[in-house]
């Protein structure tokens, strides 16, 4: 029942009868971008209320004036305490929070991919059973290619993500329920009451009023410039600048510059720069005050009238407010005397300005940083062994990602550090599916992983057993979709030093100029099939010992010009059947002392003493014909296969970064006569 002031506070908790509790006192703290906090001091004739009927149950506080509802607050009981018991009443303290508070009870690490911010927020809310929420968004918010919640509560992640996207949220209340509303522009605020400024002792009967209003202006950063880098557009500076408004009462040289800006697209960069500026200046023009209007709450505006300073008679939006209500008669004889009273203290900004949470404030904590490198597993589609994109990026499965499915959807494309990376030159070794890799994070940002190393583990063992082969340095690959390997191995054990090369199939070598080999001991070659060699100029061979050739089939030698042979001692030729020499013009056999032709028991001998012919008969012009040989039947050599000539990389003009003059503008404006600042020429 209301007292003489007309004020009354009532409460309904869970399924308990409305008469179970009476309100002795309440304190309600509300603000943009944070859950409200309602503390209730209650009294009950029951000294043994079941905590299970109260905790985690809905609770609703109603503020009445002359029988008319002025304000409703609905939430969930998160904390309950039983206090003193008197002759008739037992005191209870309840802490009531919105359903959004439940998100603070779960800490998680997970990855969202190719989803808009409002989609991510919806997923988190629905996972906690919150379906009464709305988005009042004026601006377009781009999909996030890769967004990580890392070792933070769901609530902290929601607050941070909303702040990064320039969103703020507030609560709306209806009978028995409350709604979370996400907005990104002041246009989403609802129009609240008109409140006059009470200079005297006008009562609530004349309407709600503001009894104290303080106005304040503060010097804040004047403009924001954010910069980032994308490997897809390395020459593009990704720098975006936004200038603040309402700078009449301060200098315009207080620039806030930050890198990285946490964006990869120009459109997002422009929006993020504006969001950062709005957040940094969210209290540049502000007000605070006290009123008796219980309807005031974040997410709405009110009009101030009748203030002596006419400039303050305008529309304001509530960004924070603390309500206090006392109803001492609820305690009956155990309470103090006095009327039921209510008042609030509020903080406001201009209704036309969009308030945004400042990253690093209680409303939006800083993004968690990854303390150091992590281990991850390379993953990809089923049936694949190597999975990458045109940039050599791979997909990863982190041990902490409980929602990942260890396939091509497990992460974003992650860049891989190589030992050398130039314009179409350098090194390239793609981590394969199943490999364990070391992952670092640029600026410690969980949204920007990069593979910086590879490691073996109990399943993926080194190519050779250790420590038995600790002196070996090995580069061994594995045949893709087959069996076998290629290998380059260095053995550094003293007395066993060796360079070993194994090719599973072909070896192709292309040397653009000279190849020089110096082998200080033996060279052994064993070719299981053919050897084909072509020398387009001269071939020089010097053998300082002996040379032995064994050919088990035919030997064909074709010389297009002359064949010169010089022997220091003897030329000894033995043919199993026939020696046939055919000369197109003349044949000269010259010997210093003797020439002998022998065949069939006859011979011709020419020496200094004369010519001797010996045979059963010597015939001159006796007819018959000369014997004939088999003739030349040699084969031409096969032309060797060529080596594919890889096209030389095109010349790439190196982009030299030039410092922007924007960063110097503020200094140049403040330059004194004796000061000199250097601005690099373009």
UniProtKB/Swiss-Prot annotation:
The phenotype of cells or organisms lacking this gene is:
Deletion negatively influences motility and biofilm formation.
Q: What InterPro entries does the record tag this protein with?
A: Gp5/Vgr_OB, Gp5_Vgr_C, T6SS_RhsGE_Vgr_subset, T6SS_Vgr_RhsGE, T6SS_VgrG/RHS, Vgr_OB-fold_dom_sf
What family does this chain come from, according to its entry?
Belongs to the VgrG protein family.
Record function comment = Part of the type VI secretion system specialized secretion system, which delivers several virulence factors in both prokaryotic and eukaryotic cells during infection. Plays an essential role in bacterial mobility and biofilm formation.
This one is known as: Type VI secretion system spike protein VgrG3
């Amino acid at each position: 029942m209301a007292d003489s002031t007309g004020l009354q506070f009532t409460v309904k908790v869970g399924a308990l009868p409305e008469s179970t509790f009476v309100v002795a006192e309440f304190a309600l703290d509300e603000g943009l971008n944070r859950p409200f906090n309602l503390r209730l001091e209650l009294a009950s004739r029951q000294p043994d209320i079941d905590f299970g009927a109260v905790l985690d149950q809905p609770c609703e506080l109603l503020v009445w004036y002359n029988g008319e509802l002025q304000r409703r607050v609905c939430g969930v009981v998160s904390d309950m305490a039983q206090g003193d018991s008197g002759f008739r009443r037992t005191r209870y303290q309840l802490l009531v929070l919105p359903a959004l508070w439940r998100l603070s009870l779960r800490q998680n690490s997970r990855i969202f991919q190719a989803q808009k911010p409002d989609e991510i927020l919806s997923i988190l809310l629905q996972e906690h059973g919150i379906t009464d929420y709305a988005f009042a968004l004026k601006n377009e918010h781009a999909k996030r290619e890769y967004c990580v919640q890392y070792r933070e509560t769901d609530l902290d992640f929601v607050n941070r993500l909303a702040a990064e996207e320039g969103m703020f949220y507030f609560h709306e209340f209806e009978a028995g329920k409350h709604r979370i509303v996400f907005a990104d522009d002041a246009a989403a605020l609802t129009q609240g009451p008109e409140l006059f400024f009470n200079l005297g002792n006008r009562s609530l009967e004349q309407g709600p009023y503001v009894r104290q209003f303080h106005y304040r202006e503060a010097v804040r950063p004047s403009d924001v410039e954010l910069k980032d880098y994308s490997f897809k557009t390395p020459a593009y500076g990704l720098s975006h600048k936004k200038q603040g408004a309402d700078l009449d009462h301060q200098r315009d040289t207080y620039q806030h510059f930050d890198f990285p800006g946490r964006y990869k697209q120009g459109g997002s960069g422009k929006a993020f720069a504006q969001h950062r500026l709005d957040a940094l200046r969210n209290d540049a023009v502000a007000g605070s005050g006290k009123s008796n209007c219980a309807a005031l709450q974040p997410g709405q505006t009110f009009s101030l009238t009748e203030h002596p300073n006419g400039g303050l008679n305008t529309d304001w939006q509530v960004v924070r407010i603390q309500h206090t209500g006392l109803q001492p008669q609820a305690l009956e004889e155990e309470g103090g005397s006095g009327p039921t009273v209510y008042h609030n203290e509020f903080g406001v900004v201009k209704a036309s300005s969009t308030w945004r949470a400042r990253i690093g404030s209680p409303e939006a904590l800083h993004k968690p940083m990854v303390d150091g490198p992590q281990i991850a597993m390379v993953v990809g589609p089923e049936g694949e062994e190597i999975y990458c994109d045109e940039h050599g990026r791979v997909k990863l499965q982190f041990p902490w990602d409980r929602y990942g499915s260890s396939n091509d959807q497990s992460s974003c494309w992650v860049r891989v550090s190589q030992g050398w990376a130039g314009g179409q030159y350098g090194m390239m070794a793609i981590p394969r599916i199943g490999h364990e890799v070391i992952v670092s994070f640029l600026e410690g940002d969980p949204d920007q992983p990069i593979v910086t190393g590879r490691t073996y583990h109990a399943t993926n063992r080194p190519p050779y057993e250790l420590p038995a082969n600790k002196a070996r340095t090995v580069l061994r690959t594995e045949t893709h979709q087959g069996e076998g390997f290629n290998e380059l191995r260095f053995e550094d054990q003293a007395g066993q030093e060796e360079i070993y090369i194994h090719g599973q199939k072909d070896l192709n070598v292309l040397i653009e100029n000279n190849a020089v080999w110096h082998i200080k001991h033996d060279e052994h070659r064993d070719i299981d099939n053919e050897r084909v060699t072509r020398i387009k100029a001269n071939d020089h061979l010097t053998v300082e010992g002996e040379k032995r050739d064994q050919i088990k089939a035919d030997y064909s030698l074709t010389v297009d010009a002359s064949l010169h042979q010089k022997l220091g001692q003897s030329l000894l030729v033995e043919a199993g059947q026939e020696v046939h020499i055919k000369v197109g013009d003349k044949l000269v056999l010259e010997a210093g002392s003797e020439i002998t032709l022998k065949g069939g028991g006859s011979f011709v001998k020419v020496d200094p003493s004369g010519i001797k012919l010996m045979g059963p008969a010597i015939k001159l012009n006796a007819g018959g014909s000369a014997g004939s040989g088999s003739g030349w039947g040699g084969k031409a050599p096969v032309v060797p296969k060529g080596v594919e000539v890889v096209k030389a990389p095109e010349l790439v003009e190196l982009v030299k970064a030039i410092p922007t003059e924007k960063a110097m503008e503020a200094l140049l404006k403040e330059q004194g006569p004796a000061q000199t600042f250097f601005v690099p020429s373009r």
